[in-house]
Amino acid sequence: MSCLLSEEERLQKRINTRINRELQRDHKDAKKEIKLLLLGTGESGKSTFIKQMRIIHGKGYSKQDCLEYKNLVFRNILMSMHSMLQATAELKIAYIDPDAQRHVQLLMALRPETAQSLGGETCEAIRKLWQDAGVQECYQRRNEYQLSDSTKYYLDDLPRISSNDYVPTTQDVLRVRVPTTGINEYPFTINKIIFKMVDVGGQRSERRKWIHCFDHVTSVMFLVAISEYDQILVEADSRVNRMVESLHLFNTIISYPWFNKSSIILFLNKKDLLEEKVMHSHLIDYFEEYDGPKCDHVSARESIAKMFISINDMRSADIYPHFTCATDTENIKFVFDVVKNHILQQHITEVVPGL
């Protein structure tokens, strides 16, 4: 009997040892996971940033992956055309081309969400209207209505995109706009450390879901579209400036107790669009506290950065700002290398003991 008990005890001891070993391994692995929470208003560039992580630190986009975006590119183009044609009417801008109304009727009868090609008459109508001086005037006034940042990029390259053998490039994929709904996670590994990037919808209707992502966040990455200083929030009933909306949201986020121990990385995104826009739309016309020169993108972006950083006066943690262009892979690779090193240094003792 004693021999039997002894054998059972030895078996139980081996089982307990194995369980403890697995628990220790799981605990060690958990410490090697870094959770990065991407926040910001709608269209600030969060989803594009995720795509860049896939390109830089993941498997990238194969030809087959890119082909899956083909219809989305077509839909983005048609949605942009619909937005401009509706705005042309609302802004009472006249077309120059005598055949413009025929092209307008053809395009407005199409449903962007079902688009699978841009052939024949559709392509010709888009090309003619994009060349029309009235549509070009409407495009120049795009801050007065909602229009995708990728509109000019796609329409200027219409011959390539409308060809029968069209395969979207990686840049085409990066510029596709699909509103984020729900919670999307993208894990990737760097030096045996798992970075789990969490992207949530930025529209007002999506923000109530954010709280479900707030546990165990290593760093909050807040994206701001700095080119939106002269644009109005489409979701709002009143005319809310999109930059003001972003400032209010940032203030709310850094005040949450969940993030007291999290670093705050501020990505001041769309610096390329800001550089172009300040040449004809002046920051002082929308933010009277701006005291820099007109047509100076460096002064303008530094002023916007100060608006956000100054919100931090009541918070003990630091904010780490970076100017970015989310569609520029080299820029994002450089910036994220800096951010990654900062995150690893800040959390080195709890994330990777002994490193």
Swiss-Prot record:
Domain G-alpha: 32-355
GO BP terms in the entry: adenylate cyclase-modulating G protein-coupled receptor signaling pathway
Gene3D superfamilies: GI Alpha 1, domain 2-like, P-loop containing nucleotide triphosphate hydrolases
Gene Ontology CC: one annotated term: cytoplasm
Residues that hold GTP according to the record: 40-47, 174-180, 199-203, 269-272, 326
Domain of life: Eukaryota
Region (G3 motif): 195-204
Sorted UniProt keywords: GTP-binding, Lipoprotein, Magnesium, Metal-binding, Nucleotide-binding, Palmitate, Transducer
Keyword Lipid biosynthesis: no
Family designation: Belongs to the G-alpha family. G(q) subfamily.
Pfam families attached to this UniProt entry: G-alpha
Entry's Gene Ontology molecular function annotations: G protein-coupled receptor binding; G-protein beta/gamma-subunit complex binding; GTP binding; GTPase activity; metal ion binding
Region (G4 motif) location: 265-272
Annotated spans, G2 motif: 172-180
Binding site for Mg(2+): S47, T180
Organism: Geodia cydonium
Protein name per UniProt: Guanine nucleotide-binding protein G(q) subunit alpha
Function: Guanine nucleotide-binding proteins (G proteins) are involved as modulators or transducers in various transmembrane signaling systems.
Keyword Nucleotide-binding: yes
Stretches the record annotates as G5 motif: 324-329
Covalently lipidated residues, kind S-palmitoyl cysteine: C3
Region (G1 motif): 35-48
Subunit structure: G proteins are composed of 3 units; alpha, beta and gamma. The alpha chain contains the guanine nucleotide binding site.
